[in-house]
From Swiss-Prot:
One of its GO terms (cellular component) is plasma membrane. PANTHER family: UPF0702 TRANSMEMBRANE PROTEIN YCAP (PTHR34582:SF6). InterPro entries: DUF421, UPF0702_alpha/beta_dom_sf. It is a multi-pass membrane protein. This is UPF0702 transmembrane protein YcaP. It is found in: Cell membrane. Coiled coil: none annotated.
């Protein structure tokens, strides 16, 4: 075998006329996956639950094999598609009649912010980092957590955000990128400060240094009172 043989790397022993069959097989599997997505009624991956993603991965694995392996017939992948479609319908019906099964397969929504305060332990137990969570909030126009009455991490990974009215906005943790905020271990002036980890708000005097009473973090940033601009 010759190393870096471009013809071997590109085609190996595959005849040129098989490439047309690969195109046909690819179109066939694309149509199957597309029909399944249409059947689920989802418009994008972010709308899918964990169970639905698992179904798609299983179908994709079968579809990938039939697309370019000449010894894999096309009818079995149709059987896989029909089986998965029936399984999907059955599981959806069962979940509609069993909340426990729905919680097992889909998971539960998690309240991450309540009354402007971050439930950092719940966030740490989720599959989302603080950086990702704060980025999602910023994309929804959130500048500081005191603007948020309730934020829920949904089972599909998206975040539902409910805001305080302007006259009810609280002092909160500023969630702008770190180069846009100042952090202190010794605070420079008397004011309300927010823990950068858990968003706990306490009043501190100039020159004061203390650990957060909620999470024992030593770093603070000045609490923001900014209201939403709509």
């Amino acid at each position: 075998m010759k190393a870096f043989d471009l013809h071997r790397m590109a085609f190996d022993k595959v005849p040129f006329d098989f490439l047309g069959e690969v195109a046909l097989r690819s179109l066939y599997t694309f149509v199957l996956v597309f029909l399944f997505l249409k059947m689920t009624g989802r418009r994008g991956v972010r709308q899918m639950s964990l169970f639905e993603v698992l179904i798609i991965l299983t179908l994709g694995s079968a579809a990938g094999d039939v697309a370019f392996y000449d010894d894999v017939p096309m009818v079995p992948v149709l059987i896989v598609f029909i089986t998965l479609a029936l399984l999907y319908r059955l599981v959806m019906w069962l979940m509609a009649h069993s909340e426990k099964l729905e919680d097992l397969l889909e998971g539960k929504p998690v309240v991450i912010i309540e009354d402007g305060e971050l439930a950092w332990s719940k966030l740490n137990n989720s599959n989302m980092t603080e950086f990702e969570f704060f980025m999602e909030l910023r994309l929804r126009g959130v500048e500081q957590l005191g603007q948020v009455r309730l934020a829920i991490l949904e089972t599909n990974g998206q975040i539902s955000v409910y805001f305080f009215e302007d006259d009810k906005v609280k002092p909160g943790l500023l969630i702008l990128p770190s180069d846009c905020t100042q952090r202190y271990k010794v605070v420079p002036e008397s004011a309300d400060y927010a823990c950068i980890r858990c968003s706990e708000i306490i009043h501190m005097k100039a020159g004061e240094k203390q650990l957060c009473p909620r999470c024992a973090n030593p770093e603070w940033t000045k609490a923001s009172r900014a209201k939403r601009v709509t």
